[in-house]
Curated annotation (Swiss-Prot):
Protein's recorded name: Eukaryotic translation initiation factor 4E
Recorded disease: Autism 19: A complex multifactorial, pervasive developmental disorder characterized by impairments in reciprocal social interaction and communication, restricted and stereotyped patterns of interests and activities, and the presence of developmental abnormalities by 3 years of age. Most individuals with autism also manifest moderate intellectual disability. A chromosomal aberration involving EIF4E has been found in a patient with classic autism. Translocation t(45)(q23q31.3). The breakpoint on chromosome 4 is located 56 kb downstream of EIF4E.
Sequence positions bearing N-acetylalanine: 2
Result of altering residue 102 to L: Decrease in mRNA cap binding
Organism: Homo sapiens (Human)
SUPFAM superfamilies: eIF4e-like
Transmembrane regions: none
Marked site ((Microbial infection) Interaction with potato virus Y VPg) residue numbers: 159
Lyase recorded as keyword: no
PROSITE patterns in UniProt: IF4E (PS00813)
Sites bearing Phosphothreonine, chain numbering: 22
Additional facts recorded: The antiviral drug ribavirin relocalizes nuclear EIF4E to the cytoplasm and reduces the elevated EIF4E levels found in acute myeloid leukemia patients, suggesting its potential use as a therapeutic agent. Ribavirin suppresses EIF4E-mediated oncogenic transformation by binding to EIF4E at the functional site used by the m7G mRNA cap and competing with the mRNA cap for binding to EIF4E which leads to relocalization of the majority of EIF4E to the cytoplasm and inhibition of nucleocytoplasmic mRNA transport.
Annotated segments matching region Disordered: 1-30
């Protein structure tokens, strides 16, 4: 005679405690996976392509704006390296609200620390120097004088490339020289290499191919 096994009632799972719920949520959504790291300023990246048939301003194009570390790297990794640009092209990174031109209200009384590279340095140094320049800007690397920084420009030219950090007030000796010293150190330039700071006004009115330096480090 067949025997019938008695039905067994499944044991219910014990209720989840609040602590276990919290642990479970942390596993699913670790804040590090989705929280972006904000920068102190919002920045705008511009691109200039020298088309002789257009005006200077028509050749200048805003690529993108960003205000987090993650968005900076996403943009940087998406665009062409400076060393791959055609001669006559520029990248400019400026604080949002400042246009990369001398005439801008924040730039017109300012100037630039200028790094001049020879043609051989396009392959060896240009991209490294430009990235370090960008990191100096977005990382506010100039201590109390980071507010004096407006932006930076890389000019890709057949005769030799240039990188410059622009500041807002050329008469502010303390800020300008501090920025220059920190910048030179961050680029790893040896002491024997001298870099110069030129006011935009002097550059605009220069007679000849060179502009006098207001400061050197």
């Amino acid at each position: 005679m067949a025997t019938v096994e008695p039905e067994t009632t499944p044991t219910p799972n014990p209720p989840t405690t609040e602590e276990e719920k919290t642990e479970s949520n942390q596993e699913v959504a670790n804040p590090e996976h989705y929280i972006k790291h904000p920068l102190q300023n919002r920045w705008a990246l511009w691109f200039f392509k020298n088309d002789k048939s257009k005006t200077w301003q028509a050749n200048l194009r805003l690529i993108s704006k960003f205000d987090t570390v993650e968005d900076f790297w996403a943009l940087y990794n998406h665009i062409q390296l400076s060393s791959n640009l055609m001669p006559g092209c520029d990248y400019s990174l400026f604080k949002d609200g400042i246009e990369p031109m001398w005439e801008d209200e924040k730039n017109k009384r300012g100037g630039r620390w200028l790094i001049t590279l020879n043609k051989q340095q396009r392959r060896s140094d240009l991209d490294r120097f430009w990235l370090e320049t960008l990191l100096c800007l977005i990382g506010e690397s100039f201590d109390d004088y980071s507010d004096d920084v407006c932006g930076a420009v890389v000019n890709v030219r057949a005769k030799g490339d240039k990188i410059a950090i622009w500041t807002t007030e050329c008469e502010n000796r303390e800020a300008v020289t501090h920025i220059g010293r920190v910048y030179k150190e961050r680029l790893g330039l040896p002491p024997k290499i001298v870099i110069g700071y030129q006011s935009h006004a002097d550059t605009a009115t220069k007679s000849g191919s060179t502009t006098k330096n207001r400061f050197v480090v």
